[in-house]
């Protein structure tokens, strides 16, 4: 299985209302300097793989999504829309990986203002998945 961030990236791009395009305003692992309005997905420490389901390779990773925007309210609205798009998704296959559930574990929350005066928000998700 690939990194969870790769699959979540595809999920977010598929929601056209979010207006996200990979490598344009949606990134993985590194928040680019431009554009100022963007979304970045980070793979973060999750839970240990389920030992009771070792034959299925059942994993429980987590991700953090960070939204940066020049306007506080616009950034907040986008991270709320991302939460709505991902929270509660279940029994979906993406890139040969079955996601049995995705749920918001914390956030959204205002993280800080970056050095350029952009508002940054974060949200965390736990995922449960196995090879399809």
Language-model regions, residue ranges each:
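Mid-chain, well-packed structural core segment of small domains
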Residues: 67-91
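Residue-level signal for secondary-structure boundary sites
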Residues: 49, 73-75, 131
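Oligomerization/assembly interface segments of phage tail-like spikes and tubes
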Residues: 57-71, 82, 119-129
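Short beta-strand or tight-loop elements
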Residues: 37, 61, 107-109
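Small/polar-rich, solvent-exposed N-terminal microdomains that initiate assembly or binding
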Residues: 1-55, 77, 89-95
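Acidic-leaning, charged glycine-interspersed low-complexity segments
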Residues: 87-132
């Amino acid at each position: 299985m690939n990194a969870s961030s790769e699959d979540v990236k595809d999920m977010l791009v598929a929601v056209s209302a979010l207006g996200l395009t990979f490598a344009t305003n949606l990134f993985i692992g590194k928040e680019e300097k431009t554009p100022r309005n963007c979304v970045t997905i980070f793979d973060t420490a999750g839970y240990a793989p389920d030992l009771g389901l070792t034959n299925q390779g059942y994993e429980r990773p987590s991700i953090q999504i960070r939204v940066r925007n020049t306007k506080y309210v616009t950034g907040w609205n986008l991270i709320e829309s991302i939460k709505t798009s991902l929270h509660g998704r279940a029994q979906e296959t993406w890139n040969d990986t079955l996601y049995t559930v995705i749920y918001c574990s914390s956030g959204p929350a205002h993280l800080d203002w970056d050095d350029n005066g952009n508002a940054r928000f974060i949200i965390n998700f736990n995922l449960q998945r196995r090879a399809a």
